């Protein structure tokens, strides 16, 4: 009979099975064969489990090393990245003005730095009457918030992310009112978005009154031909329609801005010294406008000076006359109807008496 004998030897981290074959001269050995077969099966299963454990350990090690490598790469990339530039927090210490005036001024300064982080602004030089660039820090030096405030009257777009505002000094009360109106509009917008109040569509009474006034702007540097043709036509046309006309005359730099009316009404008067030629030019503009509207307007009302700016307020001549003519005609027709009715009554009475 052939008898299978197994020798087993354990090596570190693995099993090695040595199979030894030999001849056995004894009788049947079924029980020994079954026992040896179980040993073989158990050894094979143990080897399989150990192999899986080794493979799993290598995968975990690779995953861990990969994670550490990814973390190190992320740290390295974050280290190489430049930190984002934080917006500058500008703090201006005002030595004058009320708390409300300081809030209004800081609100304007904050708006300027949102337009460009360097704080670059434009201003009109009172001596040369030309637009110059400066910094808001320099512009606000020495101003008294008890008397004046800041106002953005126009904005020049430089590129997608940068714009330069045109800044002027206005009266303190004007700056405070504008700031209060802005805060009120912002609060109203928030309440509308929350659904607390509804947006009003009705026009106010002052808006209706303002609709009867037409506003035109003219620069002191206007050419005589443009004044006598284009502007003269605009003024006369509105007067013929029965509108009041306000003519705003200022320097070319100011009148060309987007918010020219706001700039005109709220800027602080700045008298400049005129040359002889400039004085003659400005006198010509005022005299020519008065000459153009002489036939269509009552006596013009002039407000301002040649050295700074001026408003010429015009009212149509025929407006009052037309109203009086219509009223007189209405009364005349009413009187005629009464007279005709009276005659009919008298005739009727006469016929009745005759019968």
Curated annotation (Swiss-Prot):
It is found in: Mitochondrion. Its main location: mitochondrion. Coiled coil: none annotated. GO terms for cellular component: mitochondrion. Residues 55-88, 322-355 are annotated as: Disordered. Keywords: Mitochondrion, Transit peptide. Residues 1-30 form a transit peptide. Residues 61-77 have a biased composition (Polar residues). Residues 336-349 have a biased composition (Basic and acidic residues). It holds the Pfam family mIF3. The keyword Transit peptide applies. Belongs to the AIM23 family. This is Altered inheritance of mitochondria protein 23, mitochondrial. It comes from Zygosaccharomyces rouxii (strain ATCC 2623 / CBS 732 / NBRC 1130 / NCYC 568 / NRRL Y-229).
């Amino acid at each position: 009979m052939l008898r299978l004998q197994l020798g087993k030897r354990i090596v570190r981290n693995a099993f090695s099975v040595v199979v030894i074959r030999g001849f056995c001269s004894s009788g049947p050995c079924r029980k020994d064969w079954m026992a040896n077969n179980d040993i073989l099966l158990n050894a094979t299963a143990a080897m399989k489990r150990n192999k899986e454990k080794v493979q799993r350990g290598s995968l975990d090690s690779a995953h861990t090393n990969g994670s550490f490598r990814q973390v190190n790469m992320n740290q390295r990339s974050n280290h190489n990245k430049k930190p984002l530039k934080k917006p500058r927090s500008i703090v201006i210490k005002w030595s004058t003005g009320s708390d409300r005036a300081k809030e209004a001024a800081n609100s304007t300064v904050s708006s300027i730095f949102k337009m460009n982080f360097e704080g670059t602004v434009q201003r009109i030089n009172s001596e040369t009457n030309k637009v110059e660039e400066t910094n808001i820090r320099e512009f606000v030096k020495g101003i008294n918030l008890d008397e004046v405030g800041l106002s953005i009257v126009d904005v020049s777009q430089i590129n997608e992310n940068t714009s330069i505002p045109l800044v002027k000094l206005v009266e303190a009360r004007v700056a405070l009112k504008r700031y209060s109106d802005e805060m009120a509009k912002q609060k109203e917008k928030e309440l509308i978005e929350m659904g607390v109040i509804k947006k009003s569509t009705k026009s106010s009474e002052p808006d209706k009154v303002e609709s009867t006034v037409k506003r035109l702007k003219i620069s002191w540097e206007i050419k005589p031909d443009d004044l006598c043709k284009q502007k003269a036509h605009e003024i006369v046309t509105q007067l013929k329609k029965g509108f009041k006309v306000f003519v705003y005359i200022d320097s070319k730099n100011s009148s060309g801005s987007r918010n020219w009316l706001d700039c005109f009404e709220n800027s602080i008067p700045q008298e400049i010294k005129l040359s002889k030629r400039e004085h003659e030019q400005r006198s010509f503009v005022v005299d020519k406008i008065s000459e153009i509207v002489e036939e269509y307007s009552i006596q013009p009302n002039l407000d301002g000076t040649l050295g700074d700016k001026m408003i010429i307020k015009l009212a149509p001549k025929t407006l009052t006359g037309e109203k009086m003519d219509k009223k007189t005609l209405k009364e005349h027709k009413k009187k005629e109807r009464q007279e005709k009715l009276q005659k009919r009554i008298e005739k009727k009475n006469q016929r009745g008496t005759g019968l």
